From Swiss-Prot:
GO CC annotations on file: cytoplasm
Ranges where the record places region Carboxyphosphate synthetic domain: 1-403
Region entry Allosteric domain, spans: 937-1076
Protein name as it appears in the record: Carbamoyl phosphate synthase large chain
One MF annotation (Gene Ontology) recorded for this entry: metal ion binding
Amino acid sequence: MPKRNDIKSILILGAGPIIIGQACEFDYSGAQACKALKELGYKIILVNSNPATIMTDPDMADSTYIEPIHWSIIKKIIQQEHPDAILPTMGGQTALNCVLDLDNHGILKKHKIEIIGATINSIKKAENRKLFEKSMNKIGLKTAKCEIVHNINMAHNVIDKIGFPAIVRPSFTMGGSGGGIAHNYEEFKNICTEGLKLSPSKELLIDESLIGWKEYEMEVVRDKNNNCIIVCSIENIDPMGIHTGDSITVAPAQTLTDKEYQNMRNASISILKEIGVETGGANVQFAINPDNGDMIVIEMNPRVSRSSALASKATGFPIAKIAAQLAVGLTLDELKNDIIGINSTASFEPSIDYVITKIPRFNFEKFLGCNDRLTTQMKSIGEVMAIGRTFQESLQKAMQSLEIGVSGFNSKIKKYTSKSIKKIKNELKEAGSERLWYIADAFRMSIPMSEIFSLTLIDKWFLFQIKEIIDIEQEIQKIDINKIRYNHFKYFKKKGFSDLRIAQLSNNSEKKIRSIRYNLKLHPVYKRIDTCSAEFANDTAYMYSTWEDECESSPNNNNKKIIILGGGPNRIGQGIEFDYCCVHAAQALREDGFETIMINCNPETVSTDYDISNRLYFEPIILETILEIVRIEKPYGVIIQYGGQTPLKLAKELEQANVPIIGTSPDSIDKSENRKRFQKIVSMLNLKQPKNATVTNLQEAIIQAKSIKYPIMIRPSYVLGGQSMEIVYDEKNLTNFFNNVCINFKKFPILLDHYLENAIEVDVDAICDGTHVFIGGIMEHIEQAGIHSGDSACSLPAYTLNKNIQNEIRSQVKKLALSLSVKGLMNVQFAIQNENIYIIEVNPRAARTIPFVSKATGVALAKIAARVMIGKTLLEQNCIHEIIPSHYSVKEVVLPFNKFFGVIPELGPEMKSTGEVMGIGKNFKDAFSKAMLAAQANMKKSGRVLISVKNSDKKNIVSLAKKLKNIGFKLDATTGTALSLINSGINARLVNKIQEGKPDIQDRLKNNEYVYIINTTDSNKTIKDSKIIYNSALQDKIHYDTTINGARATIMAITSNPKKYITSLQKMHHQIKSTN
């Protein structure tokens, strides 16, 4: 059947910002859908609020709207663009919920817009727990014993029937948000209260516990002719009770019998038919009782998902692309298999002859005091995927990819005692992010296999695999590595041992182990991901390393090869923005005739799509793998500046190994990263820095701190996302920092800065070609200096800085770029205090603001800088004059505190946000208002506001309180703040702090009296009232600000109209070009 011709234009909904439970896998799926449908000749209208996505690049769609994914905004876009159809299955839960809202408001019916890829009925049947259970019963499939409730009273009535432990799952949420496992009445009440608030339909499913059952997933694709294929089976190593996004998973499933697999396969196909997924992909989750083989259906997602991205990368089968093509009427047998080409169609199920392991990446260290135990609510930030010929090989490669300081099964226990045995057993029973390594320690401590199984409920097949690795480790510790033979060494490598891990076990250096291996002429070979287990020849160079005999890499002798090192797993501080830059580098250099080679290990990203670069190596970004790929590919150059700190940390070792690094040299990178060397350059240029000193130990720090004066900002070298940065207010804080944190940074000096209070922070992105400097954009932060730049909203152009200050900033950026011999991208951060300009730091690499600036100005900075690295000047690329747009763009951040209940959501020098959104308006307040709507800030136009600020903010709060009064808000304030307001003629109701009398803050919060909270505290104090305020605000979705600057911007936004300026990126960029 040909594609549908009755549809001319399609509106695609994106997923919005990166949050826990919904990450960059939806940029991957959305980008694939845009490309596929555009190639078929459809007009594509795209809506997404996330500027850091490839899908929002202006060439991906005909009309691109970086706007909030909110039904009221989509309504305006529909009125402007008049689409024929809407595709909601590429944008995760956000897009599905939005299309339901559009349907409920009658907008789709009014404008005669057809939903493709899914139907309202199929979405409701899959997402509504009662309808889903009814559908499964109809086709003879079991589901867990469960009840639907809509309030706390109903919940209490059903729990006695279900019994404890019980699993609570809210409807229409993502990543298990608001859910959890309740072991008693108190936990049950708390989880249900939270779940009801987060569920858009105010509906909870109370499930019987299936903890300990084995969990599986099937990725299924169906077309309109009822052709169905299973793309991939996925097995969770962790049993039921842990969210699948937080589980270690393996593909294909390893412990299913053929009969179980066939039953699951048939059930999956029946489920898609019954739910009504007629065209596209879906994910179906099952649980199997390991005692008797009983199978039940957990749930299904009638859309592409996190697992779809993993399955696509695991098999090479582009699920999102195929699903988009099926949505417009094509069938599986009409679509070719892109990897194999003409020999096969998409109707053949992929066959794989290797093993995939996915391990999630957590960031609990960023949220002190959070509950780090793993449950049904997802908490991981990112993930890695590794490929090997065996499970053991892929598992060890996955661990090497995580960048958490492990090279394999590194021990978590320093000294084995009876106390440590207790610790190990507790970690096995109550799963945390490090349980895998504690299992290894359990084997080292000779804890019986049967006991490890009873504590973890992980299938014994996986436990035996881990035990064998630990046995081999003990063998490595005993041998004389200098006398090792080729076959013996190869045996270790086949089991997944890296050179570094062998070095650690044999008490040698990695360099020595590599030298021994090279002398033995032992090197990996590379196999291809081809969807068919090598049954057909193919030209797609999507590869992984292993230790067999035949190599399928077949590198050519082209001397125009560029290797791009990716950013590895998503984590706070290093996210999708860096992948965006890597993709742009590959695109630009391919356009210029270079063969691009990508090395990365993140299955969620666009950079690991098989058609982004000429050759893709899905490998850990570690020294060993890079040197091996460089050895066989012999590239012209290697780009290390686009993948964040992951590749930058390897710069010196790569240079020592004669790897041809292009762009800014490792020495120049060190000049900016090494605090002592950078200080000399700033001094030479007669520029200002806050009073500072570089120290290497506590004694030096105490002496220098007396000279610098408190408060002091502590900045380690070679970190990203403000890792371990802290503001300290006295010697006690300083001592604690050095005793608890600095042990991780022994190799590098530590910078102590005088902390500039109430300063404005400014970010500048620029490109230098060695002769000229192009200013990409000057961004003014909304939060004051001291809040990490990645956690502060910012505006382009600057919204309060005068022209003289901005011109001086431009001058200083140019001086720094030329002095540091930057060749490519650089980012400079300044603090402005009383018209004085202070340099905070310079990063001669891609910054997380590059996508935002590129979208705001229409200048593809990452592409231009990549061309600079290969020798093209800025003049040759016509990059001469800075682009200053007439509109305002505001980047706002999205914070994950709702996943870490009990943690004070306080902003500081260490980054905590997971993602970002962008708002565009004719003025600052409209742009900021739109950004807040996109970030799902719950702003009200009237109601009661609670204000409680620290002493240093009491002067500044007065004018803001006046504005709130004028808008029509009623004010409450704590004692000191109320006194300041009343003395300034502003009426405010006094509210008691805890223990000051009833009713107090806690009572008023419980009574839902507030619509907005302004609460600032001294960073060096933990205030009981503040913790209660923050937690209540999170639980009840009350908008809150923790800084005066943030409150000032919020109040401006409250008075704006975000819907009056909605335009496409293409029109906006055309306007910029015509006026610059």
